[in-house]
């Protein structure tokens, strides 16, 4: 943790005046004492260190809220505690005084308003006849006409968050999830009007999603306690179908006859397996094997198939930097044949049963049978793969003759009878009405309703969402956001004991500040203080809906400039760039640009630089815009020439790149080229790239310094550790080369040292722990924080 030090310039010595594991910060020197705040007693208080006696005393004794933002004018200290401002005069010896501050305000930021919410859509569900949609937007549920009619806000609850609205297949009700009671519950709204009905009561955790049974009698939901729960839509009675100790359930769907459900469940080997469950007998049966990851199961509307995706295509991609491989794009679309007498829909036509049911018209859905028959014995062996290239798929709908699915950002259809694949729409998602006649597309913030498409569709007129207007009352909304955040941690934090924190007491402590929140920034601050009590990493506060000012990017030249006495600007230094990266482009260092250090910039776009107080006023808005510079080797317009450059928006990457290059040179020089150096900026793609960029060319070094200081984190540190741990167990040689190779490839067997500091964060914090735990080498520097907790959905 931070300590406070005294530096003596004359003696060139330093003295640590705190030297403990607590956080000691913000020193203020007044007279013979140095005041600072410290959490050595768990709550941040004001302390004073006497420079004469060397003794430290505690000045304040707050036990509930931390002291925040102390500052001094050299005589008086002011600080904030629990939302109030206090003044402390060290000379008087009196207790800190609360300063009563009254600010007159019209409270314009937190006024009630009626807000258009068409840009905040989070979900939608089409009615069975496709004449209307239930649209969820910014915590409200709207009943919206597909073409013409009245848009109705059926919730109007600024103090609650409604979501996942779903129209019942019989068209009589809209179900949705609401936290208006303080917990997430399932609610029902009769489409003819009237008051909504709370269907579930006394729920004890976060409900993930809801799903109607095709007969409209039941509603399924999954929750954060890894349960599948079925609710009777009439009585509200509910039963827990199952609970999985190993993880949550995903993609739970009913069969057409409402007797079965299918879902994905993670196994002990972390492979997702698809199951069917008989709601009548209470028995569960596997659809897929544990050998392959499978997901997204849906029943075909005729009840003959379950369509799903599975990762079974093993197509290795070999690396160029080392002899290694990776598997990606392994997915395919599969069909499970539920009845053992059902033939594969992809059999050649001559091999099919010649007795066929009358064909439905192209625009008619296949009629569902009254009973879905599943022969559970041998079900995992009755799988058929659609002849599609490997990809990232998710099935949408099937009528038993065709399969509509998503691949990346496109919707496609595979005709099981013709064996043909058709692109339906790009840049869109699709859902299908309960009767299988209509499709709803969501694309670029707009909703479109069409007939169930059999060919490529041109999305024409979108559903008019402009009348979706929600009442916003921040005095109700902000406490709801606070409460939902508290519940999210209560239900989702990785340890049920909340790191030993009394989470109910913490809620009460910070909820007391909510009446004083007048902006979203205030709310975010309060939430941040609340979750900080858990002392864990990755506990973020998203800013929410706040007003921001668009920054006009400044054009920068990748150079250090100074003003000459003539009024022109001298180029003191051109920062070198790297040709392999556009983000490391240095405008004045690019080949062919006729300019050098020591030259002068006498005009920008024809405007003399002598006519401005600051040269950068001529570069406002010039980032990534072609700009004309007039330059000369002397501070004069006479003899000057013009060049065209493209200024950059940020010079930090250039400075960072050159800092790394200088470190490499320092290590090279200090070790006579025997030791390599790698700086890893983060544990994401950039950090992985930088490691690879400098690791493989330095495999000839005898030792290696890895620099993890100020690492921004990510998740790739295990990949780095794996490479650093490699030891050769076999050697290779060639008659025509003096080089000796190793198996495994790309090994550096010499000593390794890791540099760290307190800014090494997230996976950049885990990396030094792993480095030390695996015995890779010494770790040098100030300790990292060590409060790493991972992220999950």
Write out the residue ranges for each language-model feature:
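PDZ/PDZ-like domain segments forming the peptide/carboxylate-binding groove
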Residues: 551-611, 685
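Terminal targeting/pro-maturation regions of precursor/exported proteins
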Residues: 459-534, 538-540, 563, 567-569, ...
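Cleft-lining beta-strand/loop regions that shape enzyme active-site pockets
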Residues: 581-588, 602-793
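Conserved blade-ending motifs and adjacent loop-strand segments that build the rim/top face
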Residues: 57-71, 285-296, 393-394, 423-431
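Extended, small/polar residue-biased N-terminal targeting/export presequences
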Residues: 515-570, 637-663
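A flexible loop/linker signature enriched in serine peptidases of the S9 family
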Residues: 1-5, 9-11, 16-25, 35-47, ...
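A short helix->beta-strand "capping" segment at the edge of beta-propeller domains
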Residues: 105-121, 372-389
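Blade-terminus and WD-like Trp-Asp/Gly-His loop motifs, strongest in beta-propeller folds
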Residues: 26-33, 69-74, 124-131, 164-173, ...
């Amino acid at each position: 943790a931070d300590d406070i030090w005294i530096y003596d310039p004359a003696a060139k010595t330093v003295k640590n005046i705190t030297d403990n594991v607590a956080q000691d910060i913000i020193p203020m020197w007044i007279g013979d004492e140095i005041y600072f705040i410290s959490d050595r007693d768990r709550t941040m208080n004001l302390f004073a260190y006497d420079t004469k006696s060397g003794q430290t005393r505690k000045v304040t004794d707050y036990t509930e809220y931390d002291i925040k933002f102390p500052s001094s004018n050299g005589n008086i200290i002011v600080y904030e505690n629990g939302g109030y401002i206090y003044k402390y005069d060290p000379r008087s010896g009196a207790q800190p005084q609360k300063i009563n501050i009254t600010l007159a305000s019209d409270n314009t930021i937190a006024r009630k308003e009626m807000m258009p919410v068409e840009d905040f859509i989070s979900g939608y569900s089409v009615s069975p006849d496709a004449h209307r949609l239930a649209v969820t937007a910014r915590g409200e549920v709207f009943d919206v006409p597909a073409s013409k009619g009245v848009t109705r806000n059926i919730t109007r609850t600024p103090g609650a968050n409604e979501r996942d609205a779903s129209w019942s297949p019989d068209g009589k009700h809209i179900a949705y999830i609401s936290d208006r009671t303080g917990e997430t519950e399932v609610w029902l709204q009769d489409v003819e009007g009237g008051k909504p009905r709370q269907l579930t009561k006394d729920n004890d955790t976060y409900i993930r999603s809801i799903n109607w049974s095709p007969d409209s009698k039941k509603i399924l939901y999954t929750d954060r306690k890894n349960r599948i729960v079925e609710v009777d839509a009439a009585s509200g009675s509910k039963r827990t179908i199952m609970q999985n100790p190993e993880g949550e359930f995903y993609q739970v769907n009913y069969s057409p006859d409402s007797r079965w459900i299918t879902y994905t469940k993670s196994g002990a080997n972390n492979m997702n397996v698809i199951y069917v469950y008989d709601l009548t007998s209470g028995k569960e049966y596997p659809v897929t094997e544990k050998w392959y990851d499978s997901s997204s199961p849906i029943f075909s509307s005729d009840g003959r198939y379950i369509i799903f995706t599975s990762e079974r295509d093993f197509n290795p991609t070999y690396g160029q930097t080392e002899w290694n491989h990776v598997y990606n794009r392994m997915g395919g679309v599969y069909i499970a044949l539920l009845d053992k007498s059902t033939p594969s829909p992809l059999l050649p036509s001559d091999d099919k049963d010649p007795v066929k049911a009358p064909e439905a018209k192209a625009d008619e859905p296949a009629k569902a049978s009254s009973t879905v028959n599943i022969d559970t014995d041998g079900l995992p062996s009755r799988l058929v793969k659609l002849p599609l290239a490997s990809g990232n798929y998710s099935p949408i709908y099937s009528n038993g003759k065709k399969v509509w699915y998503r691949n990346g950002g496109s919707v496609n259809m595979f005709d099981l009878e013709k064996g043909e694949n058709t692109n339906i729409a790009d840049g869109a998602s699709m859902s299908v009405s309960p009767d299988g006649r209509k499709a709803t597309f969501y694309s670029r913030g707009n909703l479109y309703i069409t007939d169930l498409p059999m060919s490529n569709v041109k999305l024409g007129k979108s559903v008019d969402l402009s009348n979706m207007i929600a009442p916003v009352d921040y005095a109700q909304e902000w406490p709801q956001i606070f409460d939902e955040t508290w519940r999210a941690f209560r239900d989702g934090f990785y340890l049920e004991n909340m790191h030993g924190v009394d989470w109910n007491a913490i809620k009460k402590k910070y909820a007391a500040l909510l009446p004083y929140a007048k902006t979203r920034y205030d709310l975010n601050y309060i939430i941040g203080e609340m979750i900080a009590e858990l002392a864990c990493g990755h506990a973020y506060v998203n800013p929410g809906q706040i007003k921001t000012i668009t920054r006009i990017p400044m054009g920068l030249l990748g150079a250090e400039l100074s003003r000459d006495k003539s009024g022109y600007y001298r180029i003191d230094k051109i920062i070198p760039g790297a040709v392999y990266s556009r983000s490391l482009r240095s405008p004045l260092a690019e080949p062919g640009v006729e300019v050098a250090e020591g030259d002068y910039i006498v005009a920008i776009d024809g405007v003399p630089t002598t006519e401005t107080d600051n040269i950068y006023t001529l570069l406002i808005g010039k980032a990534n815009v072609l700009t004309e510079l007039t330059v000369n080797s002397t501070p004069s317009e006479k003899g000057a020439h013009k060049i065209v450059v493209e200024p950059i928006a940020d010079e930090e990457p250039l400075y960072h790149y050159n800092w790394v290059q200088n470190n490499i040179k320092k290590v090279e020089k200090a070790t006579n080229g025997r030791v390599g150096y790698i700086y890893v900026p983060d544990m994401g793609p950039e950090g992985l790239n930088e490691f690879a960029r400098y690791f493989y060319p330095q495999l000839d070094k005898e030792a290696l310094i890895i620099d993890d200081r100020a690492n921004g984190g990510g998740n790739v540190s295990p990949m780095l550790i794996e490479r650093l741990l490699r030891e050769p167990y076999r050697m290779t040689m060639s008659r025509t080369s003096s080089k000796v190779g190793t198996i495994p490839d790309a090994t550096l067997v010499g000593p390794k040292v890791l540099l760290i500091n307190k800014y090494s964060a997230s996976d950049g914090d885990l990396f030094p722990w792993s480095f030390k735990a695996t015995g890779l080498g010494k770790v040098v520097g100030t300790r990292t924080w060590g409060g790493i907790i991972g992220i999950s959905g």
